[in-house]
């Protein structure tokens, strides 16, 4: 796996991808190319070399994690390539209106298309998978299951969730927390930290799991949490949360407010004690949770966040490109 953010390894990977893209374009006359995030840079390079129009889709914020030792040169070089690819693209796609400000700074407003993200999980949950999830994650009768899907960077805010756990357990000692994601080293490091706090037995780290199992886990949970601190665009996982029909507690930050509000989630300040209060509130108020979950699914419907609507919007974008190139 590549580390997050620009790096020598990522640049080398982009060079290989661009070489393959150029070879593919020379072998077959493509009408246009569609690149997503780093793939947009690759499409820009290949498009310039082969005179093939390209669409650059930028799916969200890039917030570098300086604590992981990002090299400033690669960050600057990545930004340079990204800006050139965005400015010269036949069209650019953003996942919400917040991206328009970025595109306007890059002189892309006239050819910017806003296509809202849709939930990534589209699997039907079979009874057998649901039963397996119940057996794996619910270890006691009457247990409250609180789940978070995310990475281990401050950008994602998992530290807020971890620091809220002792507050939740002081009120709901039968609570069980599930944290999806992370590699073995990250999980080992966090398990050791939780052991020092004496709460490691209340937390389950399944790592990265299959999509069908994740869908089942979200559906059987009592509360889903989104502690994301930074960024401006809604994380895809929140859309999966809304689709699952399980109530949400979220940090009141711009990224979460892009799709969540007091209408469809419990919003709290990004403070551990207050985040814990929101979790406990949903654990003790099933009727509130049911109403928030209903409103969450209505939000997806109202904002047309479905595969059918996504394909229709993408068709319109492609039609625009083909009519102007």
Residue ranges, per PLM feature:
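An aromatic- and histidine-rich active-site surface loop
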Residues: 13-18, 32-50, 55-63, 97, ...
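Donor nucleotide-sugar binding/catalytic pocket of nucleotide-sugar-dependent glycosyltransferases
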Residues: 75-130, 139, 148, 203-206
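Nucleotide-activated donor-binding/catalytic signature segment of Leloir-type glycosyltransferases, i.e.
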Residues: 188-212
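Acidic donor-binding loop of glycosyltransferase active sites
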Residues: 90, 216-233, 246-247
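Conserved donor-binding/catalytic core segment of Leloir-type glycosyltransferases
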Residues: 140-156, 162-165
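Conserved acidic donor-binding segment of nucleotide-sugar-dependent glycosyltransferases
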Residues: 262-273, 281-287
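A charged, aromatic-enriched C-terminal amphipathic alpha-helix characteristic of glycosyltransferases
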Residues: 287-319
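Membrane-proximal helix-turn-helix segments that form the acceptor-binding/catalytic region
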Residues: 19-26, 41, 45-49, 62, ...
């Amino acid at each position: 796996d590549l580390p997050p953010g620009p790096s020598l390894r990522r640049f080398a990977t982009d060079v290989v991808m661009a070489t393959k893209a150029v070879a593919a374009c020379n072998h077959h006359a493509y009408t246009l190319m569609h690149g997503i995030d780093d793939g947009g840079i690759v499409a820009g390079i290949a498009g310039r070399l082969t005179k093939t129009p390209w669409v650059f889709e930028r799916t969200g914020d890039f917030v570098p994690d300086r604590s992981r030792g990002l090299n400033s040169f690669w960050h600057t070089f990545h930004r340079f390539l990204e800006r050139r690819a965005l400015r010269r693209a036949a069209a650019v796609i953003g996942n919400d209106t917040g991206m328009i400000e970025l595109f306007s700074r890059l002189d892309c407003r006239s050819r910017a298309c806003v296509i809202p993200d849709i939930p990534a999980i589209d699997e039907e949950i079979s009874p057998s998978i649901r039963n397996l999830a119940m057996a794996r994650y619910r270890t006691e009768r009457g247990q409250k299951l609180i789940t978070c899907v995310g990475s281990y960077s401050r950008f994602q805010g998992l530290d807020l969730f971890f620091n809220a756990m002792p507050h939740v357990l002081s009120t709901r000692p039968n609570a069980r927390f599930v944290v999806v994601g992370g590699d073995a080293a990250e999980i080992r490091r966090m398990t050791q930290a939780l052991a020092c706090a004496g709460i490691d037995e209340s937390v389950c780290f399944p790592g990265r799991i299959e999509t069908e199992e994740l869908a089942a886990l979200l559906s059987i949970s009592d509360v889903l949490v989104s502690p994301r601190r930074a960024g401006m665009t809604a994380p895809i996982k929140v859309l999966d949360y809304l689709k699952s029909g399980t109530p949400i507690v979220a940090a009141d930050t711009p990224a979460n407010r892009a799709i969540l509000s007091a209408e469809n989630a419990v919003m709290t300040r990004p403070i551990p004690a207050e985040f814990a209060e929101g979790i406990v509130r949903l654990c003790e108020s099933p009727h509130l949770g049911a109403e928030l979950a209903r409103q969450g699914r209505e939000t997806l419907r109202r904002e047309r966040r479905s595969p059918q609507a996504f394909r229709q919007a993408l068709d319109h974008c492609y039609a625009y490109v083909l009519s102007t190139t």
